Amino acid sequence: METSALLKQQIAKEIGLPQKHVESVIHLLEDGNTVPFIARYRKEQTGSMDEVQIQTISERWQYIQHLNQRKEEVIRLIAEQDKLTDDVKRKIEQSVKLQEVEDLYRPYKQKRKTKATVAKSKGLEPLADYILTLPQDDRLAETADQYISEEKEVFTREEAIEGAKHIIAEQISDEPSFRKWIRQETFKKGIIKSGAGKSADTDEKNVYEMYYEYEEPIAKVVPHRVLAMNRGEKEDILKVSIEPPADQIKAYLEKQIIKNRSTSVKEILQTAIEDSYKRLIQPAIEREIRKELSEKADEQAIHIFSENLRKLLLQPPMKGKTVLGVDPAFRTGCKLAVSDETGKVMKIDVIYPHAPVNKTKEAHEKVKAILEQHQVEMVAIGNGTASRETEQFIVNVLKDMPRNIYYVIVNEAGASVYSASELAREEFPELQVEERSAVSIARRLQDPLAELVKIDPKSVGVGQYQHDVSQKRLNESLRFVVETVVNQVGVNVNTASAALLQYVAGLSKSVAGNVVKKREEIGKFSNRKELKDIPRLGAKTYEQCIGFLRVQEGTEPLDRTGIHPESYKETKALLKKLGLSTEQIGTAELKDKINQLALSETAQELGIGEITLKDICEQLTRPERDPRDEVPKPLLKTDVLQLEDLKEGMELQGTVRNVVDFGAFVDIGVKQDGLVHISKLSNQFVKHPLDVVSVGDIVTVWVDGVDVQKGRVSLSMVK
């Protein structure tokens, strides 16, 4: 079997998916297809894999290719030294991790100047080899004397033996099987410890207090504690170290090296082993383990952030509602923005209901007039500074209205970042930064996805240690999440911003800009075909993006569905078979007729796969389907709650704002989000909070404890 096929077989085995589907995915990716396109429109070839599975295959394929390139390179480098044996070659070829390949290459690596290389240059390698033969006789002194040489700067017998010990120490350190065993043993039985660092006195809020005298088995340390220790170490507040099972490791090395315990060189070898472990192996293994723990913790933090972001982006839109956005503040005033049902800004204003200005009555009348004039149906209040005071003020205004108007507290994380960005300046050149924030808050309620894509995902407030992890890996993961959600939802090509369009499969930032430019020139797109005229939107890009772009009320009714134009011919043949036309998409009559279809026979008749036919039928019956509609709507409120109102045992409804390794933060309508600790999420054992809750979930909680002074609320989801 050729190497490429073996690698694909390996990936299929690793992730537990059929090899033919894995091979199809790799072929499609190498052919320039995007992950969303493959997931949506190539289900027959992939066995209906989702985006995450396809991305996993893509990442594993890249890693294995890189691993194999390194294997070939290492084999070549060792062969060039005429030291490549069949055994070494076989071990390299059978390695499944880069670390294993590097361990095998270590003895052959060109070394910088070390104690061992200096000793070798003095001709002491034969003496080291002699010691390793474990001689029984007492001829070491006599043998060592043969290596005394003024020319080579070996002046005494002791210096000769010392040099030989350095060579032996390095040989022990370079042995791959020893390294592998020591690494595994340290992971299994070692302890990670932390104590106060040089700058511990700067930790005024005692953020790292629990880590000043802390130790835990490496095998049990959880990711968020690794990240906390790393951060504390970086700030010089903590000192972190690994305590290995040193005695067991040295005993293992002695057993492997001193196989004849009665040898006359036993003590010399014990000293060499001690030196090898302490000076060469232990520091390297500690670095490797710390690196591995950090990488795993990074991956976990990135996974949590990605899951939280996905749920945040999938928050349901409040379609067709006119919303008043309020960006709260004290001294500088609360900024107001009315956004109509299409997202168009109808009114910008400012009020000063709070101290130090205290124009509460004037503000009350102004908001009341705005609500009436623009027939506002909902109020969105940002959750930043002065949020609770503004909430109380808005509640008083709403009570004075003749009709029911609800309000929602909107997570405004990142709104100020967006408002000061170049993108916001382009969108609203005539508005001040704070006024743009009010617009963003209103639109976040109307269409969270369309608004949140304008903000750097790292600024949306749902992460955990996001500034401490690999920024490259984090950015890649978050971009993948945004792309996946945008393409799952679909995009109205006549209303979408360039910020949203750039996440559509196949579209780059510049091509997304060209789409908007063309739309402004022609007024609006009448059908999907018109996008073929856009500069730099070639045939491949068109194929990748077009199924995710919708044209509402255009000249081709199928353009408002998620059906790809490549399937229009078969779709129209299906409609003809049913005695229907494209004008009847989404009607009850069409739904009834499709429900009576024999899928397998019809698919054969049309010459398409059954899965593709199923998707076409789904789109014809529910052309406006939005996956976000299946998510609970945000909590609508009419009254305010104070921290002082909370009593132990009180039952409340809240919205999950953030999920972290140790629990979930829930907004229950008071100033501070309450924490549901992982132990209070369920009566059952919970491995991770994400198994129980997600960002945006509406949950019932009970108050477990309130610390008014510290502004802390403990909650429970178990009655």
Region locations from a protein language model:
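Accessory alpha-helical DNA-binding modules that contact the DNA backbone or grooves
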Residues: 34-35, 46, 50-151, 488-630, ...
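Short, ordered loop/turn segments at secondary-structure junctions
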Residues: 41-43, 245, 328, 341-342, ...
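OB-fold/S1-family RNA-binding modules
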Residues: 247, 266, 276-284, 407-492, ...
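Short beta-alpha junctions and helix-cap segments that line functional grooves
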Residues: 320-325, 335, 391-394, 527-530, ...
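Generic start-of-chain signal for non-secretory N-termini
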Residues: 1-23, 30
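Duplex nucleic acid-engaging cores and interfaces of nucleic-acid transaction enzymes
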Residues: 53-56, 63, 67-77, 81-325, ...
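S1/OB-fold single-stranded RNA-binding interface
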Residues: 102-106, 115-116, 130-132, 326, ...
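Residue-level signature of catalytic and energy-coupling elements of molecular machines
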Residues: 38, 123, 327, 379, ...
